[in-house]
């Protein structure tokens, strides 16, 4: 085991056992390297690995700290609340669509029809790659909405975004491969990547999206690049056309794989939705990942991949080892929902409501003195923060407001602090004013 990994393992154990408390400041790499008798880069690599895994956070010149969101192991079993267990969304809670706007009665009718007309064959195990009807409906949807020309055989249904990433890594990754990860970027995907013995390679994001030149200069031999080109999570910027061509050229030249997470692409409030990077994929190096969690509802637990034709056999083999876990009834109901035009009408309605709800919360936050970062789409927003945004988020969380600190989404990159929040379940203007006032009070 490399020395830096041994140091990282010892640090992780100390955090798990409570010897290093959440928020504790670690010695500088210079100081600790002298004490351990190793090079400074060895300590830096150990710190970087734990930052990538979420155990540590960097706060610029202030140093490296144990994450506030890490809790030591307890000697007794405790009941804990997991994300998604609360039936009532918390104010500003991210990752949820507008649950009040979903057409539940329509969905029930479509599903009821499927129940009434199903045959004995519908009670058997479904296709390991997902039901043909749903894959065909997704092909039609992607052709019209995202400019992607593919065949049903290229589509694989999974039970969520994490399952999609796991399927990709099972099919294509080898131990020791590296993956470009947007910095800042979605933190909960990092443990899934490292669990497959793939190294996280943080690449900074600027106003034009992922800095492809930085990625090539620092990690030219990466095997994967995981990106959100349509609406970067969490900054909301789009990958420029020049950089789209640049990353495709790099992937073709390096025989690397681009995983396109088409996050929030359906919700753009100024201009038409951008076409997917996959629509430009002449070299066939892009694996497209989508989900219905934000457009419909998270309990559906249904996502999909579009893989290159030459990789179908590899993915089908892996899918046979861990078959699609989305119930056949739900898949067929969703196929009908798409094919009959209900999904399109629902998206149109949601865009209108989200534009209104975003306007309400922007105005309310501005009235309370907050500065909202402009974004062209998505279902979340960033407000700029001066000072320790992690401490600000902790205060807001204690007041029952589910904001997140932008710094918790960073790995190595530095930048201004901020709070991340969603507006999807702000149901009226009065509620927007109320929660904005609560946030101001919590941070005062």
Language-model features: locations:
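Hydrophobic residues at beta-strand termini and immediately following loops
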Residues: 92, 158, 203, 289, ...
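Conserved core of the PLP fold type I
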Residues: 121-255, 265-267, 272-284, 354, ...
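Short glycine-rich anion-binding loops that position phosphate/pyrophosphate groups of nucleotides
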Residues: 97, 229-233, 294, 426
């Amino acid at each position: 085991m490399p020395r830096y990994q041994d140091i990282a393992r010892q640090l992780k154990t100390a955090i798990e056992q409570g010897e290093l408390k959440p928020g504790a400041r670690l010695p500088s790499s210079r100081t600790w390297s002298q004490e351990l008798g190793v090079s400074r880069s060895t300590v830096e690599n150990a710190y970087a690995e734990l930052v990538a895994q979420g155990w540590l956070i960097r706060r610029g010149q202030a140093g490296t700290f144990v994450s506030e969101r890490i809790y030591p192991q307890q000697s007794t079993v405790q009941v804990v609340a997991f994300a998604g267990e609360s039936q009532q969304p918390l104010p500003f809670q991210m990752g949820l669509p507008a649950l009040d706007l979903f057409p539940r009665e329509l969905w029930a009718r479509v599903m009821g029809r499927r129940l009434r007309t199903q045959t004995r064959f519908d009670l058997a195990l479904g296709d390991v790659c997902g039901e043909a009807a749903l894959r065909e409906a997704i092909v039609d949807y992607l052709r019209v909405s995202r400019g992607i020309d593919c065949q049903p055989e290229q589509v694989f249904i999974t039970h969520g975004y994490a399952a999609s990433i796991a399927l990709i890594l099972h099919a294509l990754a080898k131990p020791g491969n590296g993956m470009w990860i947007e910095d800042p970027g979605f933190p909960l995907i990092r443990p899934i990547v490292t669990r497959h013995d793939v190294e996280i390679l943080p690449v900074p994001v600027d106003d034009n999206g992922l800095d492809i030149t930085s990625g090539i200069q620092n990690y030219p031999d990466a095997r994967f690049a995981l990106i959100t080109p349509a609406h970067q999570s969490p900054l909301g910027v789009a990958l420029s056309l020049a950089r789209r061509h640049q990353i495709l050229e790099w992937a073709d030249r390096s025989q690397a794989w681009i995983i396109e997470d088409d996050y929030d692409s359906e919700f753009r409030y100024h201009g038409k939705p951008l076409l997917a990077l996959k629509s430009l994929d002449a070299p066939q190096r892009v694996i497209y990942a989508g989900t219905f969690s934000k457009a419909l509802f998270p309990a559906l637990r249904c996502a999909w991949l579009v893989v290159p034709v030459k990789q179908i056999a590899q993915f089908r083999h892996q899918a046979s080892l861990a078959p699609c876990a989305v119930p056949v009834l739900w898949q067929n109901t969703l196929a009908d929902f798409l094919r009959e035009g209900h999904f399109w009408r629902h998206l149109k309605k949601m865009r209108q409501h989200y534009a209104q709800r975003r306007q309400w919360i922007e105005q309310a936050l501005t009235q309370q003195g907050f500065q909202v970062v402009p974004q062209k789409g998505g279902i979340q927003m960033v407000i700029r923060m001066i000072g320790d945004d992690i401490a600000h988020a902790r205060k807001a969380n204690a007041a029952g407001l589910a904001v997140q600190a932008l710094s918790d989404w960073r790995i190595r990159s530095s930048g201004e602090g901020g709070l991340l929040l969603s507006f999807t379940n702000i149901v009226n203007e009065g509620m927007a004013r109320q929660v904005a006032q609560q946030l101001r009070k919590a941070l005062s």
